[in-house]
Amino acid sequence: MPPLDFEPLNEISILERSKPGTLFCFGHGFSSRALARRLIPKGWEVSGTCRDIGSKNILNNEGLLYKYDGININKEIYNAIDKSTHLLISIPPQVSGDPVLDLLSNENLNWNHLKWIGYISSTGVYGDAKGEWVHEDSVLKPATAINQRRVAIESAWLKLYKVKNLPIVIFRCVGIYGPGRNILISVKLGRSKRIEKPGLVFSRIHVDDLAQTLEASMLNPIPGEIYNVSDDLPSSPSEVVEYACGLLGITPPPLVPYYSAELSGIARGFYEANKRVSNKKIKVDLGVFLEYPDYKVGLNALLKE
């Protein structure tokens, strides 16, 4: 429930109307910060939540941060959402569900001022496709608990769109990489593994291409839609490690057969899902032109940064 002293803001100043938009991000992390870096120079106001920011809100070139423990939504956050035109949710599914979904489902609050509500999900909802291509209308076969929760939350969001006519858009993302989070860093630190599993391929997306996809949807929202977000070249994980090692002039780690590799339960589940993720819809419907169409282009760009 909202704080007792929460009062929705009814008046919008001339200054607010002159902005392209105001974005609030639940989970202002790797992906939403990349989006903020695109939007803020264009005049957008961006803010979001973070678990630990100290005692004060932080304002930087990636937006204003509000402390949020994942459970209690305070008055500051309510007011920030009330002033926003766009809302992005990138918080991973909780065992208890999605706290933001619970908030927007509240019958006592009116969120009709929101022009776009984006929810970042995962292509993990498709499960294992035996190396075949998956599209937005492919059968969902989540194999892990977290992806089963994602399917349930996606369904609840889409129900909210149908019942309350809120502008929900779902983005199913593959593995996201970019500055500060990529295989080049793992190779340099000696943490990369070269696991051999014949026929296995993964899809990836550079965080800046995810950001441009989100922006394209924000500017031309189609409520109720689902988009896969992926690059053009599904590739084997060992191939990517080898390429990264070549760029750095480092000898690749030894090739280890998957069935004898020492992997955590989460990592092993990751290697069990074999699929190629189609990105045709974001290109056709949103006009997205990938800046980093495959991992080779992406890693070469990161090497120069």
PLM ranges: what are they?
Residues 151, 164-166, 176-189, 195, ...:
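Glycine/proline-rich active-site loop of Rossmann-fold NAD(P)-dependent oxidoreductases
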Residues 73, 242, 261-289:
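Conserved C-terminal active-site "lid" loop/helix of NAD(P)H-dependent oxidoreductases
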